[in-house]
């Protein structure tokens, strides 16, 4: 697959060959994308919600009244869940929501996510994102010129410092180095912007996985 390369100012900068095995998958597997997005979001959950159980409630554990002779129901501690101020039965506890997902599934999902952007015409390749100065207003005007309203920008191994500073206050624009490329962030933004360095790094990344 061949795609035109543009400059940040909208000018043409040649073209780049994209690997069809990464960017040219025809049948997008939504089920695999859903599995990986769920896996990513589950890992992010803090899991620190907590409720007091019986041994943690600050109430006496003394028996409420004698077992027999009152005509009432038999009760023990006031910490029991049926009493106001008592414990919570089977409440949430601190735990991890993360679960395992095979690396091959995660890699396949990333291929499908990248291919979905290319198939939808939402993939843009720029020659470079290096800026001479960190000016948010200037970068916003540049994005407006090339039609970027909601985008994920993937740079090479390192993100240009001026570009990172200029872009961080622009809403609906995320900037990540190549190592940060992931399925969730690709799908949550309308347009995927890759630098030429990022394209090369992505191809090398999948080549290493296939060789392993």
UniProtKB/Swiss-Prot annotation:
Query: One cellular component GO annotation, for this chain's record?
Result: ribosome
Specify the superkingdom. Answer: Bacteria
**Gene Ontology biological process:** translation
In terms of Pfam families, this protein maps to: Ribosomal_L4
Query: Which terms are listed as keywords in the entry?
Result: Ribonucleoprotein, Ribosomal protein, RNA-binding, rRNA-binding
Which molecular-function annotation in GO is an example for this chain? rRNA binding
In the UniProt record, does the keyword Electron transport occur?
A: no
The entry sums up its family as follows: Belongs to the universal ribosomal protein uL4 family.
NCBIfam families named among the record's database cross-references: rplD_bact
Which function does this protein serve? Answer: One of the primary rRNA binding proteins, this protein initially binds near the 5'-end of the 23S rRNA. It is important during the early stages of 50S assembly. It makes multiple contacts with different domains of the 23S rRNA in the assembled 50S subunit and ribosome. Forms part of the polypeptide exit tunnel.
* Subunit architecture: Part of the 50S ribosomal subunit.
Q: What is this protein called?
A: Large ribosomal subunit protein uL4
Write down the species: Caulobacter vibrioides (strain NA1000 / CB15N)
